[in-house]
C-alpha cells in the first residue's frame, strides 16, 4: 500500500447502504379517498368505512389501468447514507422527489468510503444493454480492496492538507472520490417511489426487466420494505400488476 504520513487520519470502509424512514403520512386509505372523490364528492371520506375487499379491488383497478394521481396523496421521508456515486443515480429521479444532501461547502467531510464486500459481483460479461455480472476471483477482490483503500487514503490526506493550509472546503473537496459516503433526506410519494423501484430493483414479478447497479438497488430494497409496511394493499397491487408505476 501507498505510504501515508503517520499523522494522517484513519479512514473507515463500509459496504452497506442505510435507509431510515424518518416520517410518513402514507396509508392505503389515502389512495381510496383520493380516488373516490371523483364519484362521491364530499362523501368520499365516508367510503373508507366500507368493505375492505372492495377497497382492495379499487386499488388494484387503479394500478392495473394506470390511474396514477390517487397514489400521490401521501408522503414518506427517508434518511439515506450511501456513497456519492449512488446519489448521482438517485437524483436522476426528479418528479415527485425532494432532496437535501450533506454539504461539502459548509462542513468538513468525514473519511468514510465505500468498498465492496465479498458478496459483490465484480465482473461484467456481455455487451452494453445485454450483460450479466459474475463473481470475481479472490485476486480481483484483493486488488479492488487494496486499490480503493490506497486511493481513498491519498485523496483524504490531500484534502486534509489543503484544509490545514487554509484552502476553502468547497475547493479542497474537489479531490475526494465518488466512493465517499454522503447523507441526505429524500421525500417521495407512493407513485414516485414505484417508478424508482421499477427502474432500480430487479424482481421476478416485474413485467419490464431492469438492470440496476447493486448499490442503489440496496437502497431501493430498504425503502420498499418500509413502504410495504405502510401501504400493504398498494404494494401488493404494484407486485400483482408487474411492478409498473401507474
From Swiss-Prot:
Active-site residues, Swiss-Prot/TrEMBL: 200
Sequence motif ThyX motif, location on chain: 92-103
InterPro entries linked to this entry: Thymidylate_synthase_ThyX (IPR003669), Thymidylate_synthase_ThyX_sf (IPR036098)
Entries under PROSITE patterns matching the protein: THYX (PS51331)
Span of domain ThyX: 17-241
Keyword terms: FAD, Flavoprotein, Methyltransferase, NADP, Nucleotide biosynthesis, Transferase
Protein name: Flavin-dependent thymidylate synthase
Organism whose genome encodes this protein: Streptomyces coelicolor (strain ATCC BAA-471 / A3(2) / M145)
